[in-house]
Structures are given as C-alpha cells and as structure tokens.
C-alpha cells in the first residue's frame, strides 16, 4: 500500500519578512513595542563593564575615584558601576575596656620594655632619677597630632581669627611717623629710676575695714551699690597740673595713662592716647567720651568673650560690669560714716568746689615727679583708694581693686566657689593668664602712687546669667613691688617703653600726635594729626576751660 508523503509537514516553510524602507536615513522607521521601554546608552567595546572582586585592598581609595569605572564613551551613566558601602550589616561594637584583676595589671610591662630596649633605665627610656614624665593632658598639648598642631599640619584651619575694631578710626590726613613692635619694646630698659617725689597731695581717704579680711566662700558678703561720684579727669583738664606746668616738669600725664603705655606689650585690645607738644613740654591726654577708663575682662585669654552686643557677656558689657564692681568694692570695704575717722591730705579735692554738696568717693591724689634723665622731668597725678591704720600708728596707703568672675564655663577658668578657699594660688594664676594686662596696670599704678598695699577682692555673680547682683568671696593683699616680681613685671622695662615714646615725641615739631595700639597686631603706631582733631565736641559744648574737669562717673546709676 502506497503512502502519500506530505512534504509540507517535514520541511518548515519560509515566509518572506517585511523590510521597512527608510528614505531619510539608516535603521527602522518604527520602534517595536517589545523594545519601547528598554534604556539605551551609547557604548564602546573597549569600555570596562565592571570590576573584578578584590579582597586585598581597602575601600578608602575608591571613595576618591568613584567614577573610574563609568563609561567613557557616552554621557549617560545608567550602566556605570559605583562602589558603595553596604550599611545594612553595620553593628555597634562595645569598646569598653575590660577591667583586669589586680594581679594581672602591668604583668607584661617590664617584658615589653626589656624587649624593645627602652625600659626605665635603658637609653631613650624613662629615667626614674631624672625629670618626671608629663601627664596625659600635657602630652596631648605637646603632640602635634592633637589640638592646633593637627590643624596646621593637615590643613584644618579652623575658624578664622577675630578681627578687633580700632579704638579710633585712622583718617586720611593723619601721617604715620613710627611703628614700634612689641618684640622691640620688650627689650628696652631704663634702670635706676628713683622713687617719685611728692609735689602736692589732695583729697580725703577713709580707713579700711579689716572685717573684710575674714570673708570666705562660706561666709560671703553681698556687694552693695555705693552712690558716690568718681572724677575721671584727663591731664590738661586737671587744674593742679595746669598750675604745676608753669614751674615744674616738662612731661605731664596721669597714672592711668602712664600704666597703659608702660604695660602696652601685654595689651591685646586697641587703645589710643593723644599727645600735645608745646615748646619743650609734652602733655599726654585721653580722649573724652571714650572707653579708656573701662576695665577689660579676659583680654589676654585664649578664648576672649564673644562680640555679641545683645549678650551680657560681650566685651563692652563685661567691661562696664567690671568697672561697676571695682568702684563699689573699693568704697564698700572702707569705714564710712560721719563719725568714722578720715585721713585728710594738705589740700582738698581739686575737682569739687566748696559750695558743692555731693558725695565724693574716697580718693587721695598725689602729684609726683620723676627724673628720667636727659633733662626729662615727669609730673603725674597718682591715686590712693584707702588707708590702713597700723598698730604703730603710721598710716599705710592702699590701692584697692576687684577681680570679677562672670561665668567660669564660658571663661575657660576655675570655679571660685570650689577653689578660692583651698587653692587661691590656682585662682590667681588663672586670672594672671586671662587678665595679664589689667593686673599689670593695677600694679604699675600702685607702684607709681607709692602705695604700701595692693588689696585685691574676689567678686562673683550670684547667678552666672544675672550680671546685676554680686557677692564678695574673699580678699587678698600684696606689696606692689613684690607682686610685680611675681607677675614678671619689670619696672625697668616699663620706664624704658615710656622713655622711648617721650624721646620720639620730643624730636617732633610742635603739634598734636596720637599713639595707638593696633587692634590685631602687636604694634604701636605714632601719628601726626591736625591740631583741630577731636576738638569738634568741645567747641559744640561752648563751655570754658575751667569747666573741663567736671567729667564724672556715677557707677551706682549706670545700667549694665
């Protein structure tokens, strides 16, 4: 039986495909639906499509070159490879040190030292008979990998330094005469300057109350607000200096102005002093309505107060607070009252008239002269704040000042209430670091006035956030010359700086000059300024010269 063979079932049939003809270019005219959502990126066969697994190298280097496996042919990055760290397997690990039993502590210490050849007595090791090792805190300070060294070495600059403002704006018509840098001034010396000779003494002093020597942290006393007038009179407005300038001396100033110049190498903030040369006489003045008489706070600190005027801890608000505290403390520690004895100098207070009925602070004025050589005779007004009655009956004159604590955490200092009674030396050392210029000025003023004692009070805020209420935590007294030695204050260098500036001015022609501390550099500049500079305020007042000494401060009513 014959079978019929179906050739169509054995062999596949061929269907002619439909080819689209693209008249405008090459390629299909329409995109099939199956390839419509597939992304496309131009590529080259030479591009690396991935990275082989490498377990030997660390992944830190790949962070810097994350795109080195990206396609270099096209601009897209759909198929680029990125090496990312998988944080899903991240776990916290307890790194707390396991406390070893006492018998296992230091078990292999000697063995390790002996192997390395740097044991206690080995060369380069620790010598038990020599210098003691530094503590961990000091080692960090010395190690360049810690603190500031790391920033300078590895490029971490930190915050930019603060740019302080100048005490006075330098005008275009001022001519710069001389620049004196601090390294040069520190090397100056004028030895063998004798004690000043009294010319005139004025004012009335009250006696010191010794009960304040028994105040401590546990027996603190509130600081009172004393309603008394303090005169802050500049040199040329002083009627006594005007009278003495006709017969005695050729250089005239006040103790505050002299202390600012003599301690200039310790200052960081800007200040200025006006100098007038008339013939062979030189008058050193402060400008009116300035902050010259305000006491700085933490001027020499590593972290000075922030420049935020709205805060009570800004430099200006702290200066007003410190001046307020200093005035009230110097008057509170005295025996006040009509029945209490007083020490009167030869002349009365030159800044008040007999018909005035005002409460004046206890201040004694000494007008003294010094021979500085080369026919230079200095005449200055110095001040005492109080007097102390000794068992022998001889009075001892005192310079009374106050240090204030505002916020130990912000000031990077020690807490007085914890350390003042037990470690007073540490508290004073911290104040010497933070207020080196202010303490040096007080010491120079006490030495110039010839005070027998420098009394320092420690005044703190009741609450660090309340700058209006304070308490007295203790007192401490020093002899001015001994205290100058303790704080490394050389009076020979101080006299040398003053003499250097006097010699520079003496070489100039008659006129008005200004010396100013640069706000951001350890430099003092001497300017030649026009004669009418700073005279606009005085001419507007229309007051005579006799009324110039009426500038006063009443700190009890100042708002701080």
Swiss-Prot record:
Chain segments carrying region Disordered: 98-166
Regions of compositional bias (Basic residues) in chain numbering: 100-121, 147-156
List of residues that carry Phosphothreonine: 128
A molecular function GO annotation: mRNA cap binding
Swiss-Prot/TrEMBL keywords: Cytoplasm, Initiation factor, Phosphoprotein, Protein biosynthesis, RNA-binding
Domain of life: Eukaryota
Membrane spanning stretches: none
Record carries keyword Membrane: no
Keyword Kinase found: no
Pfam families, alphabetized: eIF-3_zeta
Region (RNA gate): 291-305
GO biological process: cap-dependent translational initiation; formation of cytoplasmic translation initiation complex; regulation of translational initiation
Localisation: Cytoplasm
GO CC, alphabetical: eukaryotic 43S preinitiation complex; eukaryotic 48S preinitiation complex; eukaryotic translation initiation factor 3 complex; nucleus
Cited function: mRNA cap-binding component of the eukaryotic translation initiation factor 3 (eIF-3) complex, which is involved in protein synthesis of a specialized repertoire of mRNAs and, together with other initiation factors, stimulates binding of mRNA and methionyl-tRNAi to the 40S ribosome. The eIF-3 complex specifically targets and initiates translation of a subset of mRNAs involved in cell proliferation. In the eIF-3 complex, eif3d specifically recognizes and binds the 7-methylguanosine cap of a subset of mRNAs.
Subunit details: Component of the eukaryotic translation initiation factor 3 (eIF-3) complex. The eIF-3 complex interacts with pix.
Domain comment (free text): The RNA gate region regulates mRNA cap recognition to prevent promiscuous mRNA-binding before assembly of eif3d into the full eukaryotic translation initiation factor 3 (eIF-3) complex.
Family, per entry: Belongs to the eIF-3 subunit D family.
Name assigned to this protein: Eukaryotic translation initiation factor 3 subunit D-1
Organism (species): Drosophila sechellia (Fruit fly)
Gene symbol of the encoding locus: eIF3d1
